[in-house]
Amino acid sequence: MNKTLITLLLVAGSLVGAHAQIKLFNGKDLTGWKVAGTEKWYVEKGEMICESGPDKAYGYLVSEREFKNFELTVEFKQESNGNSGVFFHCGIEGTTISGWQAEVAPLNHHTGGVYESYGRGWLIQPTADKEKVLKEGEWNTMVVRVVGDEVNTFLNGVQMITLKDEKIGASTGKIALQIHDGGGVKVRWRKVEIKAL
């Protein structure tokens, strides 16, 4: 084999690896994540579960790795009050989180919309007709795609929003799953995968 062919194979292999789907949840434990707050995060029967604890406060499960441009796919099922979210480009100090959240909430509460934590608040919400895409009490698939300053979210194959925002484009950070304060929250997650773009 000549040197040119070997070089091409090595470059091709590194490009494939750079864009491979990475499982952020291994189905067994919380390896690769850090718990922030006193709320409950545990694994049961291959599912990652967040549940309100006695403090009924905000809680987060934060990735150890940071991501800039990516496509994140999560599967979730809400039980009880399913108010949660998927943060991206986030940083955290204690339980104070900065960054942006793709909303995961009960029906007609803007699942798939984008909210800036401790900043400008709601940047965009899905239109009323798209609110019905959420399947309450069933498994849902959300895709969050961030490339530069553009964010797209999809719920069960339906595009929920498109947003362009310079502040997002200039940032990077971790992925975090949220449990909302107030108590009575329980959400199950069974697929959390990311592909760098």
Briefly describe each language-model feature range.
Residues 9-18:
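Hydrophobic h-region of N-terminal signal peptides that target proteins for export
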Residues 19-197:
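Carbohydrate-interacting regions of secretory-pathway proteins
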